[in-house]
Amino acid sequence: MIDIERNQDPSGFDNNHHHYSSILSDKIGLSIHAPDEWQKIIPPHELERLVKSGDQVGIHVLVGDIRKSTFLMKESISSKRFAQITRDFMKAVRDTASKNEGWFDKFTGDGFIIYWIYGDEENQQKYISQILSFSDALLSIFPEVMNEYRTNSTNFPADTGLSLGIDSGLCTLVNIEDLNIIGPPVVGASRMVAEAEPFEVLFNVSIGTWLNEDKER
């Protein structure tokens, strides 16, 4: 753990906090992974402690999969154009996740992994509304992305689409070149997205139960 003396300027800006965050960002690439104002979600010293110790923390995990992405790449008129469409969509994914307090784990080649750190078990319902907003936003914009792929394809498959799978539970934050997550919820979300139809979202049992309870209220 890094010890830094408290240092705040007259305007109230915490130089200490900013310096600590900058050091941590350099270590694990937070500019790629963290949402804006991530320090409000988890203090920098707590994030560093979790990465160093390997202690588990409660996390919601969302895995997205672009159906038929390998086929789309193979049938592309221009590989460069395919890469540009995918890159632009991944930027939209990161930006939308950040606006909904989600962390970008990685681009998987045919999809992505996003997560929300809720912490202790009693806070497990936290971020459900943000996850729903994120999912709705992506499913709303993906038809436009599909049209971009279609205009660049010599043979566009009918079952192209975006599928989402969501699981929740204890994960470990690790530094493998930069910040990554590992744990059963990653596996669970991956299994659910594999079963989801194009433009379908599959949730784990606990999240599905909370959603049903909200509908009944």
Q: Which residue stretches match the model-derived regions?
A:
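Regulatory cytosolic signal-relay segments
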Residues: 1-57
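Alpha-helix/helix-capping structural signal
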Residues: 67, 169-171, 187, 206
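Substrate-engagement module of ASCE P-loop NTPases
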Residues: 88-95, 137-142, 190-194
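Catalytic core of nucleotidyl cyclases, primarily class III adenylyl/guanylyl cyclases
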Residues: 99-127, 145-184
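Acidic, glycine-rich loop-and-strand cores that form catalytic or ligand-binding grooves
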Residues: 129, 133-138
